[in-house]
Amino acid sequence: YEKIDRCNMVIDAENDVACDNDEDRALLRHVMGECHYLRATYYFTLVNLYAKPYVPSTAESTPGVPVKTSSKVEDKEYTRASVAEVYRQILADLDAAETDLKDVKSPATIYHVGIDAVYIFRSRVEMFMQEWQKAADDAKRALDEDSYLQNLVGWKDGYPISSDNKEVVYSNGASCFGNIVFLAPGKKSNYDSP
């Protein structure tokens, strides 16, 4: 919720930012798009950690997590929104991110959100919601933006999930990939060049 609050602060301050030229306006759009995207990912993580899975027939009555979309300090007790309400907020944030990022130049690094990351993540959310056709449509939009494949044949060292891998469209931080991926003894040969 601390990270959500930071996103809320930036989103709430949008109208306080003076943009004197197109470059400033594009930067503001990018920042707003990233904040909406990040807030969606944080709520997605929370609802999937602390609530039951999304089931279309019960999502409206299944307790989710509290939703707060304002940075204002309020003296009140927040109650859990339904799983459906949380997912609606996630999709609303992703729609806002799409609006903000669709005409913005793609980021130069994987550490900033681009439109392809929005499509990929929305596709994932829609899969969790069992909205199969919508998920397929957003996945196709992402592939239409960028459809690179990394050839792992002959890969010998380094990390396949890195900033120079064309398949990675967004990375939120860093990971110690070598500590979480293991190959069974004798299986590395499955990835050697033919």
Regions found by a protein language model. Name each.
Residues 47-54, 105-106, 128-131:
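Short coil/turn linking the two alpha-helices of tandem helical-hairpin repeats
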Residues 33-73:
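Extended ligand-binding groove/face enriched in aromatic
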Residues 130, 136-194:
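Hydrophobic-face positions in mid-chain alpha helices that act as interaction patches
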Residues 1-50, 81, 98-103:
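Conserved, well-structured interaction surfaces
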